[in-house]
Amino acid sequence: LVARTLDVIPSDALAQRLGRLPVGDLVDVLIAGELEEAGPIAAALNEAGYMLPPLPNLFFTRDVGMVIGDHVVIGSMRYGARWTEELLISALFHHHPAFASAGVLYDGSDERRLTYTLEGGDVHPLRPDLVVVGFSERSSPAALDLLCALLFERCGIRDVIVVVLPKEPTAIHLDMIFTQVDRELCLVYPPHFIGPERLAVLLRRRGVAGVREQPNLFAALAAVDFPLEPVFCGGARRSDQEREQWSSGCNFVSVRPGVLVGYERNEATLAELARAGYRVVAAPKLLKGEQAVAEGERAIITVKGAELVRGGGGPRCMTLPLRRDDP
């Protein structure tokens, strides 16, 4: 791990520093970073920097690792500031017995081609033979083609649906505008999926050459016998949709079918989910035993996340599911 870190950030001083550290301290430094000792000029200008930069985005674990069936994909991050995150996740999946799998399909920590980038916010396994992916600013067509080939060959995936995202800061990943929230429901940002502004959608099928363009995401899902009903992020008003999508209103994580975790701030979205049969449960009350979620009940566990949302993601971004029961 030290050697691979030095491949990304070559430095004799860093090599000497890391080589002397016990394992626990080494992990702390790899995550929290290591300040460089400031010389006279840097100190006078208050311009001291990091010998090894910290990893403030590591809590967005979804991007760096993906579990598809029994296999693992290590992300190939778009920006160099996150490259050392790949090394940590790769070390976990390759060497820790608790993270044993059927194999690592693709290890982005070995990838430095600029045209091969892949982040987990763009990868959505919906069924054992179906994955939806986003072509975004963070995930490139070359990497998506490679992912499709690996999924078809080794994972039993039959269909991959590709959503072509706009190059906008509000849609850096597919999970900022689309997430599945129950077996037959998904949460979407309406302008990108409903009406004249809808995004282009492609369907790639194992054993079929090329791709087929689809009228929209819901037509593509119907074509592979996986119909989903949309719930609108922000409700019916465009202004609410835009505001709540910006604050990760589409970014929920399902802890079981029909039970979600999301931000409490997105009130119009919560109201839409309530109309779909969800009950809002505040996380503090759940943890204190003041409220409970019954078996088979639809519920949203809400968290405040006032500072977390400023990082540009939600609960789905901050979780890396390791095992999924079959639907």
Regions found by a protein language model. Name each.
Residues 1-327:
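The feature marks the mature, well-folded catalytic cores of soluble enzymes
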